[in-house]
Structures are given as C-alpha cells and as structure tokens.
C-alpha cells in the first residue's frame, strides 16, 4: 500500500484543446509549491495530479498545495492493487480511525468504478463495503443523507480509499491569463483584489504609492509584508514603490482643495499604466468598490478611468465591506492590513472631497500642472523590489 495525495481540478476540464496547457501549468506550480521539501514526486495521470507522500509530511504538503490556484480539492488516500477484500478491510480501518479520533456514529460509502472490467458496479460495491463495515463495528449506522464521515472508494488501474477532501480555492493556474499590475496600498481591499484576479490565472505584480517622509518607513514595510503574503498564492512579485509627495504638493498648491484626491488618483493610474506598458502588463488592478469612499462614486471612477487606456480590473466593485473583510481573513491579509500605519491618501486630505467630479473640470485643473514632468520624475525615482516567500 502507498500513501498518496489525489489532487483534483475543475474548470481546467472545460478547456478543450487547451486543456493540456492548463494541466502542465498546474502541475508545474504544484511542484514549485513543494520543491524545497525534497524529492517529492508530483505527476499527472488521467485528469488528476498525484503526489507520493510516503516519506513526507502530508499535512504540510496539503497546506501548500491547497493555495495553488486551479486546485479544487485534495484527498490523502491509500493506493493499492485492485483486490476487493483489501478494499473492504482498508475502508473498515479508515472508519475505525474516524471513530477513534472523532467519535463518529454515522457513515456512508461512496464508490466509483472507473475500470469497467471490475465485476461489481458502483452501487454494489458501496452496499458490500457498507455491510462489511457494519458487521465489524459496534454503534455505527448508515446515513445516506447526512453522514458524519464518508468513505470514498475508487477502482481505477488500482484502488484508492480515503475519507477526507481538503478544499482549495479553485480558479485557473497562475500565468495562463496574462499579467497585470496591482495598485497595492496598505489597506484591506487591494490585496484581496489582487488575489481574486490572480485566482483567474493572471500573473500579478504590485505598485505602491507613498508620501515619504510624510508617511513612514514602517508604512512601506507593511505593504512589503502584504506582498509577501500574496506570494504564497501568486509566486514571486515585483513591487514598484513610487513617491507621490512632489505630485501632491503641486496639486495642493495649484488646484482646488476638493480635487486633491481625484487628481492624485489620476496620477497614480497614469504612472501605473506607464510602468505596466514597460513591463508587459495587460491591465491594471485596483481594490475600488462603488461608493466606499469619495473617489469611488460612479462619476469618480469614470474620471479615474479616463486617465488611462489599459483595462482596469476592479474585482471588488460590487462587494460589501464585510464580505471583503471576510475574504481578507480567509487569505491571511486582514491582520496585516489593519495595522495602524498611514498611507499617501491621508496626506493633504481635503475636508470635503468632490464626490461627483466632472471630467472637463478635472482636466482644466490638471492642465495647470506639468503632468508629463511630474510623472517622469516620479518614475525616475521609483524603487523596485523582488518579493518572494523566502525573503527574510
């Protein structure tokens, strides 16, 4: 008998002639997630990925693999040659383990006969295995509707028996849908937005705007910490840090106070687009949500969009704040995001920011500034950092 992990994927199965491309990407990313653990054998067979875990910590591997986009669920299983007596005994042993560990009193057997040469059909297998379990245990009942534990039996080229399914995040393998630049602040929203877009197979890099020395070094470090958390899902990330202070001072000196936020936002988008084009990104990603703050009204978003030509992905656009917070907790960015450090949006914050900006009026104000010079200067002083999970 061998201990293996069965890794299943979902949407990849619908990719038709491109399926093998997506499968290869997924297998590559799974290998990458466990490569530092040693010579872990990862391989694809019959529209699944398998990992041999006989000599490894299966729980640690599961924790890593479930964060790989494209993985729907993982089952730690026992694999052995097809022998129905061994199948029954293995199923019984796994049920006894569940009874000892969790005190379960109800169960169900779910069988799947993939190898049609096997003489018993799936329902017959389930009945015989269930009967064998009942004969050899006490205080256990069958519950086909809501069992405390399910015993899964599969007969393929060999037999698999397991009781657990650990769910991943699904989605598509990273790098199968282009590349995007995430405007990464230190808040709750933007890391979640980046994670959601990455889940659809988009490679993510980050751009952070700060107003140092009006904002602190620790505020910048917080963003690096968020980027490191994202690397557990997204792999290595390039983080571009841009000081917006000179631009904010110019806006504060020459433009109406209430337009500070929307004008600053347009500069951020212009700078992000300029860098995105240079590094081969096909889109920008932001954590904006309709009505959440003054610059995120529909008119505000229209004025912001008008600053760039690249598509802007806003995966949080219709989400409530509480739902965004729940997802941030799920992906482990929440506790870092709520650390009380200032960001560039708090510098020169207007008392009454415009909530219904008109594009033509904003363009007139923008014409008072040396837009091109300010952008070039900001990009010229930009810092680039390569972030990976291994960074200390």
UniProtKB/Swiss-Prot annotation:
It is an enzyme of class 2 (transferase). It catalyses: [ThiI sulfur-carrier protein]-S-sulfanyl-L-cysteine + a uridine in tRNA + 2 reduced [2Fe-2S]-[ferredoxin] + ATP + H(+) = [ThiI sulfur-carrier protein]-L-cysteine + a 4-thiouridine in tRNA + 2 oxidized [2Fe-2S]-[ferredoxin] + AMP + diphosphate; [ThiS sulfur-carrier protein]-C-terminal Gly-Gly-AMP + S-sulfanyl-L-cysteinyl-[cysteine desulfurase] + AH2 = [ThiS sulfur-carrier protein]-C-terminal-Gly-aminoethanethioate + L-cysteinyl-[cysteine desulfurase] + A + AMP + 2 H(+). GO terms for molecular function: ATP binding; CCA tRNA nucleotidyltransferase activity; tRNA binding; tRNA-uracil-4 sulfurtransferase activity. GO terms for cellular component: cytosol. Pathway: Cofactor biosynthesis; thiamine diphosphate biosynthesis. ATP binds at residues 183-184, 208-209, 265, 287, 296. Keywords: ATP-binding, Cytoplasm, Nucleotide-binding, RNA-binding, Thiamine biosynthesis, Transferase, tRNA-binding. SMART domains: THUMP (SM00981). GO terms for biological process: thiamine biosynthetic process; thiamine diphosphate biosynthetic process; thiazole biosynthetic process; tRNA 4-thiouridine biosynthesis. Its EC number is 2.8.1.4. The keyword Nucleotide-binding applies. Disulfide bonds: none annotated. Pfam families: ThiI, ThiI_fer, THUMP. PROSITE patterns: THUMP. Residues 59-166 form the THUMP domain. It is found in: Cytoplasm. The keyword Heme does not apply. InterPro entries: Rossmann-like_a/b/a_fold, ThiI_AANH, ThiI_fer, ThiI_N, THUMP_dom, THUMP_ThiI, tRNA_STrfase, tRNA_sulfurtransferase_ThiI. Belongs to the ThiI family. Catalyzes the ATP-dependent transfer of a sulfur to tRNA to produce 4-thiouridine in position 8 of tRNAs, which functions as a near-UV photosensor. Also catalyzes the transfer of sulfur to the sulfur carrier protein ThiS, forming ThiS-thiocarboxylate. This is a step in the synthesis of thiazole, in the thiamine biosynthesis pathway. The sulfur is donated as persulfide by IscS. This is Probable tRNA sulfurtransferase. It comes from Alkaliphilus metalliredigens (strain QYMF).
